[in-house]
Amino acid sequence: MSKSIFIISFYNNRSPQNLEDLIKQLMIYGQEILVVINIDNYNNLELERHKNLSFLKRVNEGMNIGAWNQGWRYFSDFDNYFFFQDECFLKNNNFFERYEELLSIEQNGIIGESINPKWNKSWDEMSLLPLNYQIKIDNKPINRVDFYQKKMIDWKINPGNSSKHLRALNWALTNKTLKLINGFPIGKNKEECIAAEISVSRKIEEKKLKIIQSDLGHFKYIGHTEWGEHGMSKLKEI
């Protein structure tokens, strides 16, 4: 039987209520649970263990994806890795069985609840859409598409022809796949973190693996407090 770990990212300035609720839901599966706590201006890497529940305190670098990457590298001997933002909640108790089934298919590289429909297009199409607005990096204007592709190239990831990607709300990957892609890139700011989110799916496809949404509809097994069930827009802007 494969050995799995649930890794939850949490920002210490937020209320712990969602985190506590998610931990309670995940405990029924009897797997190891790790909460990676992002803390501003923190200089240590500190682990606290309580049976199957551990807390890893770290500097807030790379936001959720940075926390997930740290968790995988710290707990590197599991077969399957399930990553969650603390705002996630389980909608279907069969989620673990479904995800393990999908992870057992060798061609499947990454599993999640929501492939971003607004970005499920070619880069050429994206460059013509209003979503490709200008941002400022180092006080210099640049279009989002150009910047995200540039960051991927900096990270030695081929952007490919498509911007298709799984939202970094929850992901599941095997240890074999994580080693193949060498974990996740770490963004230094919000825009770099968006680039990191897209680049993980791009690297999965670069390795000839598939990006898998767990069901035809969004958020069938795992919901998120910020997102509507159709996956098109947030319920509220933070």
Predicted features along the sequence, with ranges:
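A conserved hydrophobic helix/loop-capping motif in glycosyltransferases and polysaccharide synthases
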Residues: 4-15, 116
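Short, well-formed alpha-helical segments that are part of the catalytic scaffolds
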Residues: 13-27
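Acidic ATP/Mg2+-coordinating residue in the GHKL
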Residues: 37-40
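Conserved catalytic core of nucleotide-sugar-dependent glycosyltransferases
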Residues: 90-188
